[in-house]
Design a protein with these regions (language model features):
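Paired small-residue
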Residues: 91, 95, 106-114, 308-316
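Helix-loop-helix hairpin linking two adjacent transmembrane segments in secondary transporters
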Residues: 107, 136, 145-192
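Juxtamembrane intracellular "pre-TM" segments in multi-pass secondary transporters
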Residues: 2-12, 193-225
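C-terminal transmembrane helical hairpin of 12-TM major facilitator-type secondary transporters
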Residues: 285-328
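Conserved MFS/SLC helix-loop-helix module at the cytosolic interface between two early adjacent transmembrane helices
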Residues: 67-106
Length: 403
């Protein structure tokens, strides 16, 4: 009886509480993380920076988030999921408020790095909490809803920062977003049910390193780690530099319009849970291949020099991305038999490391070939993803036949 699981079922009050609280956590986390993305051009002008240098305001956060996940995951295995997530939200809101008061580029990067480190506690632990507490039959649906909350948060942070930066200043935009995140942190602390299936695990540094290496040797999980790296790297690269494309000749759109363009993210509210459901019909590998092909098609469409066509291309690209992310997140939760918190942390470490490295390096290709250079690089990243998905599909199909 000691190992009996007390899962939260779909339709119950606790399920609703989990959905709302993790939606708020995702909203706060990703509005803070991505609020600088649509104002990279503004930061370039204010501090006389190149596109690649300006992108460090985002890459510093995602890099520190990636590193932090290697520690916050194991920390949550020891002290509990809710404690880590709650503390992370409050700290991230505080660092973002401090960032809004900085006047030098170096100090801004430092504060953004601290913000990313704080946010790692939510990003690393939320999927683990769901995998432990939600009934397995509902997990893919619930994971999709969580990612939908992330999507809306990312969209809202981007559009809010764009509008406030145009009407007032980039400092005011960060200040308002930090206050909103603080309110959501309070609601999260109050609403989220305490873990029922959590069992504390003592992880020492040597064991953490050993487990890290072991997971990279796993035939399925290791490929999911690489998939996350190229997926997120591709997504961030496109949205880091599309603003530069549209703010310059021949479009000259407003900063506010760049924020509104983020509305394409809302397709993730549909495609994330939908992909979770379609896994049962087509399998993880096939769903990943379909999602990646949709991303490539969207990117090709975005080459046309008409804003409505570019919008359509980004819409398809985003739909494919959020579907693929939902599939990989669900698969990680299912494959991690022990130390789920740390396995999820390694996946997200790879995911955000891809964002940091590829998102900044791709600035060189913007300088060389503008949008064509960016698109070429991203298609190469996605082609690697398709190769990984084909291998995953083969391994998973063979494993299912042996059952």
């Amino acid at each position: 009886m000691q190992n009996k699981k007390y899962y939260i079922e779909k339709g119950t009050k606790k399920f609703i509480a989990v959905t709302i609280s993790l939606f708020l956590a995702g909203f706060a986390t990703f509005s803070i993380l991505y609020c600088v993305q649509p104002i990279l051009f503004v930061l370039s002008q204010n501090f006389s920076l190149s596109p690649a240098q300006s992108s460090l305001s985002l890459s510093s956060s995602t890099a520190m988030m990636a590193i932090g996940m290697l520690f916050t995951g194991p920390l949550s295995d020891k002290i509990g999921r809710k404690k880590v997530m709650s503390s992370s939200l409050f700290l991230a809101a505080f660092f973002t408020f401090c960032c809004s008061k900085m006047n030098s580029w170096e100090h801004i990067i430092f504060m953004r790095a601290l913000t990313g480190l704080a946010l790692s506690g939510v990003a690393a632990v939320a999927m683990t909490y769901l995998s432990e507490e939600i009934h397995p039959n509902t997990l893919s649906f619930s994971m999709g809803l969580y990612i939908s909350g992330n999507t809306i948060g990312g969209f809202s942070g981007r559009i809010l920062s764009s509008i406030l930066a145009e009407k007032f200043s980039w400092k005011i935009s960060l200040e308002w977003i930090s206050i909103l995140a603080f309110v959501f942190a309070i609601l999260f602390l109050y609403l989220l049910p305490s873990s029922k299936n959590f069992h504390s695990i003592a992880l020492h540094p040597k064991k953490i390193f050993t487990y890290f290496i072991a997971q990279w040797k796993h035939p399925i999980v290791s490929k999911l780690f690489l998939m996350g790296f190229f997926l997120m790297g591709s997504f961030i690269t496109v949205f880091n530099y599309v603003g530069y494309r549209l703010l310059l000749e021949p479009f000259f759109v407003s900063q506010e319009t760049i924020g509104i363009l983020s509305i394409v993210y809302l397709i993730g509210v549909y495609s994330s849970p939908k992909a979770g459901i379609l896994i049962e019909k087509y399998g993880e590998g096939r769903m990943l291949i379909i999602s990646l092909v949709i991303m490539i098609v969207g990117l090709i469409i975005s080459q046309w020099n008409r804003i409505i066509i570019i919008f359509l291309g980004l819409f398809l690209f985003s739909a494919g991305f959020f579907a693929a992310h939902s599939v990989t997140s669900t698969c990680i939760g299912q494959q991690a038999r022990n130390n789920r918190g740390y396995t999820s942390s390694i996946y997200l470490f790879s995911y955000y490391l891809g964002s940091s490295i590829l998102g900044t390096i791709s600035g060189i290709f913007w300088t060389i070939g503008k949008w064509t250079g960016i698109s070429t690089m991203v298609i190469i990243f996605l082609y690697i993803g398709i190769v990984l998905a084909i291998k995953l599909n083969y391994i998973i199909d063979n494993a299912n036949e042996l059952k």
